[in-house]
Amino acid sequence: MVEELLDDRKFITVPKELADKLKLTSNRLGTSITDFAFDALTQALRIEEMGSSIKEAVDLFQLVSMQRGAGNLSINRGNFKEIIEQLNEEKRLELSDIWEESGRWYGAYLKAKLHDGDLFNFLKRDLKFSWNLDEVDIYQRDLLVIIRCVSFGMSMELTDLLVSFISGLMDELNFSETDRDILRGLVIIKFLGKLN
């Protein structure tokens, strides 16, 4: 009879430390380890079937949680471009200042929420996602940081706002801009960490 009950089950060995964490988490959630593990593995398979990975899903969850916590709003790039194009030069400069201040605020928010080692890795994913960019690279060596963003469909107006946002953010993270190369949809900015 016991053998019949076990026919549709397989045992998976995991390190003791992981099993202990699973037990603590399942107890906190008020469920059994078996049910918790079943749900987690089912969701992992679901993610794989969608062509993604667990790491990508967790990274995206972190990103969306941070965006939500910061009060960020998603808006269609084409619609936003139309709004910007209707502004006169003075209003565009005001908008650029607002975006730079927004970058400063977001930089302070990221400092408060993330550990230093995670910050630039997160920022790379964040910029790509929130600005709908095709490529983002962030190189860091000692006090030098180079941020490179590419978007094949971004207007010059949106490119300028992206630059303002990044400049404000990096200033809040205690980095001074040393060089920039800006074309429509292509941004390369170099920063140097400020010594306290």
Residue positions per predicted region:
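Short, hydrophobic/π-rich interface segment
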Residues: 133-184
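Short Lys/Arg-rich basic patches
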Residues: 1-16, 23-27
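C-terminal edge-of-domain segments
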Residues: 182-196
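Charged, alpha-helical interface segments at or near domain boundaries
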Residues: 50-58, 65-77
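Short, basic amphipathic alpha-helical segments that act as recognition/interaction helices
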Residues: 31-55
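An N-terminal amphipathic alpha-helical segment
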Residues: 73-148
